[in-house]
């Protein structure tokens, strides 16, 4: 009997003790439990992955909606700015037209006033010149007669 025989006997006894203590069943149950745990973890990971994909799709959808809404807001703001610009341009043009018309009216009034002033000055000068000429040429007797005639005309016009 050599050492190999005793090693074989020891191995058989060891395996018998393991079989008696039901170690292979415990190892099998442990492996089955671990396999079930891994299976559950894989199922949970698949569920979490699906949820993550749904959340990602929802995020992308919301992002696209937000981009569309932002585009709509920008387009609306551009339309409003264009309308405000057109209103401001129209109001400015109307203001300039009113100011031009007012300036033209003032110029026309000033022209009329200037013409009237020139006419009045011309009349005053003519009256003064005529008065001087008449005063130089008319004697006292003729002046008295002219005064009486003018007085009678004024009286007849007043009555």
From Swiss-Prot:
Main localisation: membrane
Sorted UniProt keywords: ATP synthesis, Cell inner membrane, Cell membrane, CF(0), Hydrogen ion transport, Ion transport, Membrane, Transmembrane, Transmembrane helix, Transport
Record's bilayer topology term: Single-pass membrane protein
Sample GO molecular function, one term: proton-transporting ATPase activity, rotational mechanism
One Pfam family this sequence matches: ATP-synt_B
A GO-annotated cellular component: plasma membrane
The organism's place on the tree of life at top rank: Bacteria
Family affiliation: Belongs to the ATPase B chain family.
Quaternary organization: F-type ATPases have 2 components, F(1) - the catalytic core - and F(0) - the membrane proton channel. F(1) has five subunits: alpha(3), beta(3), gamma(1), delta(1), epsilon(1). F(0) has three main subunits: a(1), b(2) and c(10-14). The alpha and beta chains form an alternating ring which encloses part of the gamma chain. F(1) is attached to F(0) by a central stalk formed by the gamma and epsilon chains, while a peripheral stalk is formed by the delta and b chains.
Protein name (database record): ATP synthase subunit b 2
Organism of origin: Brucella anthropi (strain ATCC 49188 / DSM 6882 / CCUG 24695 / JCM 21032 / LMG 3331 / NBRC 15819 / NCTC 12168 / Alc 37) (Ochrobactrum anthropi)
């Amino acid at each position: 009997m050599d050492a190999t025989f005793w090693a074989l006997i020891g191995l058989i006894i060891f395996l018998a003790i393991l079989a008696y203590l039901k170690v292979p069943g415990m190892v099998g149950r442990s492996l089955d439990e671990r396999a079930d745990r891994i299976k559950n973890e894989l199922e949970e990971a698949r569920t979490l992955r699906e949820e993550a994909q749904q959340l990602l799709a929802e995020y992308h959808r919301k992002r696209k909606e937000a981009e569309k809404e932002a585009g709509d807001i920008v387009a609306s703001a551009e339309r409003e700015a264009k309308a405000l610009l057109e209103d401001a341009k129209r109001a400015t043009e109307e203001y300039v037209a009113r100011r031009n018309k007012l300036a033209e009216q003032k110029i026309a009034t000033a022209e009329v006033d200037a013409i009237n002033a020139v006419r009045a000055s011309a009349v005053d000068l003519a009256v003064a010149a005529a008065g001087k000429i008449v005063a130089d040429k008319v004697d006292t007797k003729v002046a008295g007669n002219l005064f009486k005639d003018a007085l009678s005309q004024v009286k007849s016009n007043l009555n």
